[in-house]
């Protein structure tokens, strides 16, 4: 449902977009996510925005769940992106769990053992792991120089500002 809303929003702004089923171009082999880049590149070459999502995908064992976050990281790598944007419902990664008062946004996270301590409290946020998984599912991609940026996509204008390089509140993640 969310995917259709996103595609509809793009189309209403005269931005050509199409829903691309994750199962049509992604599978897992030997525990590794394999993305067939042709569908993505073909749409991008035609200036059409592919909109995909986390889903159940085929694997050599059976079926597995692939989060939208991991899909974004892996797609960025095969497409040669420098940064992955994560529009969230919060302003970024906080220095304390949500239930603790006086929390502050961490502007930049450089992955280290200490990072694990900060993110442990966020595992409960959603079924695929919350902020912890959002960041750690991209470790291999981060190691290759791709950055992540987590920001609040519900703030009007934030998505546009993030994509055009304007300064907004959020968390940069790098290795």
Task: State where each predicted segment sits.
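C-terminal catalytic "cap/lid" subdomain
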Residues: 1-175
């Amino acid at each position: 449902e969310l995917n259709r809303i996103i595609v509809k929003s793009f189309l209403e702004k005269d931005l050509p977009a199409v829903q691309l089923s994750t199962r049509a171009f992604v599978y897992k082999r030997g525990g590794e996510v394999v993305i067939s880049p042709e569908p993505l590149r073909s749409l991008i070459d035609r200036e059409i925005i592919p909109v995909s999502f986390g889903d159940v995908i085929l694997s050599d064992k059976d079926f597995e769940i692939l989060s939208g976050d991991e899909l974004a990281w892996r797609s960025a790598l095969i497409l040669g992106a420098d940064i992955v944007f994560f529009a969230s419902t919060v302003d970024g990664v906080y220095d304390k769990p949500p239930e603790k008062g006086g929390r502050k946004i961490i502007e930049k996270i450089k992955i280290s053992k200490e990072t694990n301590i900060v993110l442990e409290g966020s595992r409960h946020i959603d079924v695929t792991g919350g902020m912890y998984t959002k960041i750690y599912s991209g470790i291999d991609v981060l190691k290759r120089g791709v950055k992540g940026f987590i920001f609040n996509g519900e703030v009007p204008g934030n998505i546009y500002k993030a994509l055009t390089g304007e300064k907004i509140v959020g968390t940069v993640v790098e290795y």
